[in-house]
Regions:
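Enriched for short, Lys/Arg-rich terminal
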Residues: 105-131
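Basic/aromatic recognition patch in beta-strand/loop cores that engages polyanionic ligands
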Residues: 87-113
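Compact soluble domain cores
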Residues: 8-10, 15-16, 23-91
């Protein structure tokens, strides 16, 4: 049983509260930390996919590329969601998040890739969440 405050009253609740969000593994947390360090160093890149133009997607959300990177830097385990259909990547080295931005639920997928012998955080998806 948990003791919770609701409108100034103490109430008992037998629900479990997930304090760590959606349970990122230690390896995933390290990967997210590394991604954020690369972003702050300027080692970051958006990918245009055949089926999506990231600039149009950002415009639809109402943010710039710079603001998108700022939003990515605020991601935590609370925003993490398991990637049940990693169709684009055949590895578990990507991380997927969902976050409210400008009143919209946004789907964000990140990965670290190497470009010109330099590791970069790559944003594979940053668009409205359609699920």
């Amino acid at each position: 049983m948990l003791l919770l405050k609701q409108k100034g009253k103490d109430i008992l609740c037998n629900k479990k509260i997930n304090i760590r969000g959606n349970h990122m593994t230690g390896g995933q947390l390290k990967l997210l930390t590394k991604m954020k360090k690369l972003i702050t160093k300027g080692n970051k890149k958006f990918i245009n996919r055949r089926d999506r133009d990231y600039l149009k997607e950002l415009l639809e959300i109402g943010i710039t590329e710079s603001l998108a990177w700022q939003e990515i830097l605020t991601l935590s385990s609370y925003n993490y969601v398991p990637d049940y259909k990693p169709f684009y990547l055949k590895s578990d080295s990507s991380l997927v998040f969902k976050k409210e931005i400008n009143g919209n639920r946004v789907y964000i997928k990140l990965k670290i890739e190497e470009y010109n012998n330099k590791e970069m955080t790559v944003c594979l998806s940053f668009h409205l969440d359609y699920k």
